[in-house]
Amino acid sequence: MKKYILGGIAAVLIVIGCMWVAKGHNCKKENTAVAVSANDDNSQFVTLTDVVPDVILEIRYFSTYNFAGQRIDGYEQPIALLTKAAADSLKAVSDDVKAQGYRLKIYDAYRPQKAVDHFVRWASDLSATEMKPYFYPDLDKSVLFKQEYIAEKSGHTRGSTVDLTLFDMNTEKELDMGGTFDWFGPESHPDFCGNLDTGEYTGDNQLSPKGRSITAEQFAHRLILRKAMLAHGFKPFPTEWWHFTLKDEPFPDTYFNFPVKQK
């Protein structure tokens, strides 16, 4: 009798475990799209230009000029969506840098899970390397998962992360940051060639596989953006100078999947 009871309990536990995984909890990191419960509630999101009217948009994943060379799933319009909390904080950043002669230029904001799944599929296709010369010339595509350039989840999907740069209102050009958005390499690290604690330019480029470097001016430009973002409640990302997340993000454990389009 005990054997039958224990067998029944085990069966129930297996069913419960399967239900738990189906709801989107993934214990093992694999090179496949993570299963998340599709959350299509965009009620707490705003169109960024409604909050920051003078922001410049260049939504790379709506275009084909990105590391995949394809328009990415889920980007139905070239607009930026963010949680209201993140958009309000970004307005404060905009006011700050505007006083210094700059405008914000946005590459990406909220990113649906279906877009992240698209990245995962692309990274798994080792033959699709059309954009390698422009975004990852020093890397074999097979290492993108291992080195975490591509992952199954993204902070962008929680709605309070933004990729951006500065636009110089005097020159009417992007401020020269010494590297392009979505460059896969150490040259994109915020501390590349400099000390973030002291703000000192060191010129240390030992991590660059090709001995690339950035100038003192380019490092200083990165610091202008970084200081403004940190001053208004955003936290940086250690490997991308353009990537910031609201510290007090309202949905730290929720991954949304509604498309990027006008509300």
What positions do the PLM features span?
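N-terminal Sec-pathway targeting helices
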Residues: 1-11
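Sec-dependent N-terminal signal peptides of Gram-positive bacterial secreted proteins and lipoproteins
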Residues: 12-16
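Extracytoplasmic cell-surface/polysaccharide-interacting catalytic and binding patches
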Residues: 19-109, 116-239, 249-263
